[in-house]
């Protein structure tokens, strides 16, 4: 079972990807992890990727797909995997399709965790973090016992720049411009499944499991 997770930043697709991986005993694969592993191990592909990253340039799609193919060719992927964070664009999706078809493989499901922009802004701008111990809170869902103070170490809680409404809106615009077309791409292939990401985390997961049965 080969699965791609789609959804805007803050939709919760990473959390769902981990839960799927755990339930079905398949790897949860993110491109960030692949880059870090290849660079740490000093692989040829990793060093090529690092040369682009060091210059502040995007790693070419062919290189990313090559690293991804190397990862999904490992023994722990024989029963499938969950891809999180790739593909992000149509060219990446096409490159991935070409590479997989060369191995007589294909993606089985593309799952879109659907949450409105308004909900995502509310979700993310409600986050607070402790810069001292790293603990995270949400003013609505997981509030600290004392407002603005970390339960664990008593330090001040802050709203990270990444979680500020204007930053979130910019990230959402990039998502809609680049990644939204993937919804149409996988719809045409007949493998797109959409779940309501505004539900409780467990309910979202139950809806995904129902799709995968």
Residue ranges and their predicted role:
Residues 1-213:
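Glycine-rich phosphate-binding loop of ATP-dependent small-molecule kinases
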């Amino acid at each position: 079972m080969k699965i791609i997770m789609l959804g805007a930043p803050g939709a919760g697709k990473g959390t769902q990807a981990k839960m799927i991986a755990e339930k079905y005993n398949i790897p949860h694969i993110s491109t960030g992890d692949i880059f870090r592993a290849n660079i740490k191990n000093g692989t040829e592909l990793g060093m090529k990727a690092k040369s682009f990253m060091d210059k502040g340039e995007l790693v070419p799609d062919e290189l990313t797909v090559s690293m991804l193919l190397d990862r999904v060719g490992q023994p722990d992927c024989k029963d499938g995997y969950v891809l999180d964070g790739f593909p992000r664009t149509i060219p990446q999706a096409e490159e991935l399709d070409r590479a997989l078809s060369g191995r007589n493989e294909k993606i089985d499901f593309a799952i879109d965790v659907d949450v409105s922009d308004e909900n995502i802004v509310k979700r993310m701008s409600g986050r607070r973090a402790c810069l001292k111990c790293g603990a995270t809170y949400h003013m609505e869902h997981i509030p600290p016992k004392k407002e603005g103070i970390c339960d664990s170490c008593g330090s001040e809680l802050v709203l990270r720049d990444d979680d500020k409404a204007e930053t979130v809106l910019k990230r959402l615009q990039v998502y809609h411009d680049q990644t939204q077309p993937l919804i149409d791409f996988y719809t045409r292939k007949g493998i797109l499944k959409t779940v309501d990401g505004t539900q409780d985390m467990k309910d979202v997961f139950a809806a995904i499991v129902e799709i995968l049965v």
